[in-house]
Amino acid sequence: MGFEYGYSITKPTTLTVWEAQFGDFAYGAQIIIDNYLASGESKWKVESGLVMNLPHGMDGQGPEHSSCRIERYLQLMNDGWCNLTRDSLLSENYRPLRQSNFAVVCCSNAGNLFHAYRRQVRRDFRKPLINIVNKK
């Protein structure tokens, strides 16, 4: 994941995606998530548009096939989303998202995933996106 993080910094206009497979892949990347993804912009003023696809393990295969604990990533978020309203989502200023350190989404269909990826590339600033997915 360190390679993908570095690539997303050097090539900010590309869609850089890292996918954790079954098992403990996200746990091995936790150091990079804590030190670079969650706090990289506040520490070093470096923006990253890295997308992380993490399996949630709630689709019947059991917790041993999960690389994602949703509550862990929600606890890593700062308070930028506290002021999120419907009007701020519909407008183009994205101020609550600019104040947060990353976004966590759980897309329910392919259209939602397309627009989440599209938003990652089309914005004039970069924030990491953590996408909670199933492995089906």
Protein language model features and the residues they cover:
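Conserved thiamine diphosphate
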Residues: M1-K136
